């Protein structure tokens, strides 16, 4: 009886340990599925919009961004512009687009604000910075967590280097940014995320060092032209497979 009980306990300990080990992998996989579904739904929804819908939403976002330029240091003085949560919110859940970072292989929804609910599973747009539509006198700032056991998010943002690119997809626009500055600052140091006259920037923010989180990693990108998508060329041929045993002697011959 004691031997049987010991066996059961060992099996239970094994499965508990296995669950703990597999939790980050399974949870990250689950979150990636949710993120992909949100992006697919977003793309499906924007395909149903009319050109005048795009024009109206971009107009509202442009007006918001212009107001930001006229407010001195909104990140410090706490001034807010009415209607923020409704701008670019096409499906009522706060998603304004998504970010794609090829270097670290992430594609994440971008939501209004940086609440815990947003940052635990996606990227948040910091209110008081430009909405992500590009244009002169804009500086969009996006934030995501790093090192969560449940989601990868910006965990590998420190692997970005100058010259790397990332894109923001907002409605029917794809904005491409090339990394031109990487800095580590203290949380209260915000000079590097202000709007600069005539510039079009997007800065990605996460905590650093990994697991300590006393500072902030800032990865800034300057807007560049979005490359044309590569054309897929289909070649139709009547080619047939040759037995490798026939080819080998021919290749080996002097």
Task: Cite the ranges covered by each PLM segment.
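Solvent-exposed, non-transmembrane regions of membrane-associated and secreted proteins
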Residues: 4-7, 13-253
